[in-house]
């Protein structure tokens, strides 16, 4: 028996609405120096991406894109204990993105985008993140424009969309 599309859409919307609530419960329980990698996986699930670090630690990306406005990077030491936890979609981190940075460098800094689009006529690969906005009636997006020829950052921009 096939489930009607509208029922699937309702369950997807409920899941998206509950995800931030899960973060509100789970994130305060993750404590650097105490929480184990197994506990993080149990509470948060599998990370969207894992970055290996030179010192043997690993950083796990817990991204809430495209609907959320946060991305948590949790660094696990070689002893399997949480070292740090940081919400990386911040004005300070967005300001660190510079011309020429690679896609990997950008992802490492602020996590994976909520959407991607290639504009051949502009020679750009566009990555977009939903970020915290000024008012609840607006959605704010941070955009990184990568040059298709070089692969590096060409520029950054923002756009604001009114909800409703």
Predicted regions and their residues:
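Sec-dependent bacterial lipoprotein signal peptides
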Residues: 1-20
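Residues within mature, well-folded domains
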Residues: 22-164
């Amino acid at each position: 028996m096939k489930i009607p599309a509208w029922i699937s859409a309702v369950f997807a919307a409920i899941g998206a609405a509950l995800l931030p609530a899960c973060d509100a419960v789970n994130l305060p329980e993750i404590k650097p120096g105490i929480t184990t990698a197994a506990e993080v996986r149990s509470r948060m699930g599998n990370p969207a991406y894992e970055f290996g670090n030179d010192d043997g630690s690993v950083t796990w990306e817990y991204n809430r894109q495209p609907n959320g406005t946060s991305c948590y990077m949790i660094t696990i030491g070689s002893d399997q204990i949480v070292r740090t936890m940081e919400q990386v979609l911040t004005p300070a981190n967005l300001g660190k993105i510079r011309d020429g940075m690679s896609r990997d460098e950008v992802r490492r800094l602020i996590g994976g985008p909520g959407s991607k689009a290639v504009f051949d006529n502009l020679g750009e690969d566009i990555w977009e993140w939903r970020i915290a906005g000024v008012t609840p009636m607006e959605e704010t997006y941070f955009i990184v424009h990568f040059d298709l020829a070089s692969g590096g950052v060409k520029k950054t921009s923002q756009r604001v969309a009114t909800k409703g």
